[in-house]
Amino acid sequence: QARQTLAGLLQSHPGNLWLALGLGEAESRAGQAAQANSRFEQLLREHPNSRPVALTYAEILNEQGSREAGQRAQAMLRPLLSQSGNDPVFQQRFARASELAGDSVRASEAYAEAAFLSGRPEQALMQLQALKRNPALDYIGRARVDARIESITPTVLELRRQGVQDPDLDRR
C-alpha cells in the first residue's frame, strides 16, 4: 500500500526527491530490490554527492546483505567520507558496507568512529586497540589507527578522572 501511495504522489509531484527516496525504500522492502536499485541509481545520477540519496541507498544495499551490495555501498559512500566523517549514521552505514564488502579493517575503523561520535569514546578506544592486533592492518592503516587512538585517549582519561563510566562496558 505504501508503494502505491508514494507512486501516486510521485506522479503528482515529479522530481520530489523525498518521495522518490521513500518509494525506493518501499520497493526494496516489498522485495523489489532490482526496481529499487534502479530507482536509486537514477537518483544518484540526478543528485550526485547527495547525502540523503547516498545514505538511504546505502541502507537499502546493506539490508540486501550481499558482498556486491556492500561493495557498491562502500564505493558510493567513500567520496562523501571527508565531508560526512563526523556523522555517526554515516559511519555506521559505511562500517556495515565495508563489513559486507569484506573490508574488515575499514569496517572496524568506521564502527569505532561511530561509537566515538555516539558518545562512547571508551568503546571506540577499545575497538581501535583490538584493531591494532589485526594482522590485516597495513602500515598506513596502523598509522591512521594510532593517530585516532592518540586523539581519543585524552577524552577517555578525562572521563575516567571524572568518574564517568560507559554503562555498556563490562568491567570485570
What are these regions (language model features)?
Residues 27, 61-64, 98, 115, ...:
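Residue at a conserved register position within TPR or TPR-like alpha-solenoid repeats
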Residues 33-38, 65-70, 100-107, 137-141, ...:
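Alpha-helical linker/edge segments of TPR/alpha-solenoid repeat scaffolds
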Residues 14, 48, 84-85, 102, ...:
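Short coil turns that delineate tetratricopeptide repeat
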Residues 22, 56-57, 93-94, 110, ...:
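Canonical tetratricopeptide repeat
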Residues 9, 42-43, 79-80, 114, ...:
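Canonical positions in the second alpha-helix
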